[in-house]
Amino acid sequence: MSGALVELVSKGAQDVYLTTSEGMSFFNLKYQRHTNFSQAPKLIKEISTEDVSIIIPVYGDLLNAVWFEGVDLLNSFFGAKFSLYIGGQKVDSYDFDYSSDIWQNYLADTYTKSQEINNKCSTTNPNFLSLHYFFGDNQSFIPLVALQFHQVEIKIDFAPGASAQNIRCYGNYIYLDAEERKRFTNKKMDIIITQCQQIKKTLDCDDTEYYEEKATEAQNEYNEANTLLQALQTADPPNNTAINAQQAIVDTKLALYNAAQATSTAYTSPTNGYNDIDISQFNHPVKSLFFGFTTKQAVVEKDFLSFKSADIQINGTPLLENMSPLYFHIVQNYNHTKFGIIQYDEDKDCPFYTRYFAYHFCLDASSYKPTGTCNFSRLDNAKIILRNVKKGYERAETEELIIYAVNYNILRIDKGMAGVLFAN
């Protein structure tokens, strides 16, 4: 007798609560038929720093993805801003670091998308960049067929000095059958959309370790230069031209080291890295908050952002208190995303692939549908408190902390036109 048959008949009183002959079967093959459609990619246009407006042509009925292809898009778009307009009204806008440092680490809706990291820390494919508006992920779309009197436009604000040539913008278009197309054109629609809001604040850091590490780095550079000088001086025969040139380098490195050491010795932190950041200007039901700064290189100790503890307060009442950096990355991703990147540098208490931390009001940040929000429009005040903030020694002496809020809004489409229902 097979052990599987023994298992099958070995049922008792407790199993009444678990199984029934009338229950759901795991062995029914079910599927749903869908309406007829087709899809195809189309080249929208080539852009450069001199041609930054992309008018979306109506090549199909729906648009469900927009992306760029080119050479070294990471450096071309670094520091850029991407803004979406419908009928001349700005619907959404975000900086490059939202798509390079935040979206893949905290909001990706598939594993494949979460692995497509392109920032100064990790580069999967620098020749590809996808846009992340309310359409393009989670099988969402924008119904171009219903916008007979409004055009869709994407504007790019490149960073000063950026070089961008022969960048191709593509879109993925959906083509519908006549009956479903008629439904889109005749029906008023209220579409849930996401938007990005942003606040910037000069960051107060405890730079004691920052200046100590700068002095150590300057000392190492001086020692390396001096070692090379000694090797040149003991060479036989000596090269006086090379010795004189290296001596000048050593003198410069010594002066830089002495200056760095003097700065480190004299430095005292005026605030101990305490930051009280007002975020009351955010509006609408917010699903997620992100705070940090743009990743500028892969070596974490040179580039990191960390703090001892953080609070979030709403209407003067603590929502959370004295939470660690680990909580705002590992715990948030572990509990609130399906595909978040959880890697973390324990020595510097900083995420490995981003310099942003997160807090989610929602249950599932990867989902397009609402699973929880905090309506900032109904708050009198809100703030984030960061204590003992520290940064990597190759960051600028003065850094801006960037806080993003991802909120929900409603895009109403009616009679060939569209508009955002709730303004700021």
Located regions from the model:
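Extended amphipathic alpha-helical heptad-repeat regions
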Residues: 205-263
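Short, low-complexity Pro/Thr/Gly
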Residues: 1-209, 262-424
